[in-house]
Amino acid sequence: SWCYTAQNRFKTSKDILQDLVDIVSKNGCLLLNVGPKADGTICEEEVKLLTEIGEWMDVNGEAIYDTHPWRVQAEGNTEVVEGMFSEEGRKDFDSTDIRFTCKGDCIYVIPMKQEGEDIIVKSMGEDSKDFHAIITEFSVLGYEERPEYKREADKMIIHAPFVKSDKPVVYRIRMK
């Protein structure tokens, strides 16, 4: 709604962040509306959503702000239903659903969620036509612990069992 509606149904912060990552990976912009009440205040649910989104952006914003699409926009099994009022056909993302952005000497690999399992990145295998760089740093934003990675002919395997999130997770690959 473009204004306050008492019976409004809200997306979760997870859904909004997944939409944001998907849109930015396609070089798009997300328009997020907050409908104020007549007195100018916003309801508690909207404050909660904005706070959760802001906390995620504080950690992962470098993969969003001033980035552009990488050679590969997306990998994964989940079909994204696009267009206005498409929420009814929305399917949950899983850890095979990965988006990519890049900036400067970094590529950001962004699984839409991660539950402790290995992440398989098909477009970053040793034989990939899309990724030829030398990796100088491999990290996961928001964690001090470093993930492990291994490149095989047809894929990169990211091993980070300490990462568990139903929201997008950002791996930063610095390269030369």
What does each model-identified segment do?
Residues S1-K176:
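Mature catalytic domains of secreted/periplasmic carbohydrate-active enzymes
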